Amino acid sequence: MSIERKLAAIMFTDIAGYTESMSKSESKSLDTLEKKRSILKPLLKEYKGTFVKEIGDGTLSYFESAVNAATCAVKLQEATYDDKDMNIRVGIHIGDIVFKDGDVFGVV
């Protein structure tokens, strides 16, 4: 069985302080999460990113271009900069990924 590998830029995002925020106001925190989604999804499309999954307030996406990943990350942070409830953290790594069951794996 062959494994499909692909060189990609992986982008992780999360909202700093989200767990603490949930303990204070679930409704407000869920609204913040929905706002993040509404900003991120069009940016992924614009910069040719592929959304893989969401775990709580974190997301995992990948890009074929490191430049597109970095630009998307900057645009996400610019779009949320003035929102005190949405302190977005972004990590980008580059390396080979493996696809399995709609998910990606790798040491990136």
Language-model-derived ranges and their functions:
Residues 86-100:
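A short glycine-enriched loop-to-beta-strand structural element that forms part of the catalytic core
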Residues 1-72, 79:
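Catalytic NTP-binding/metal-coordinating core of nucleotidyl cyclase/transferase enzymes
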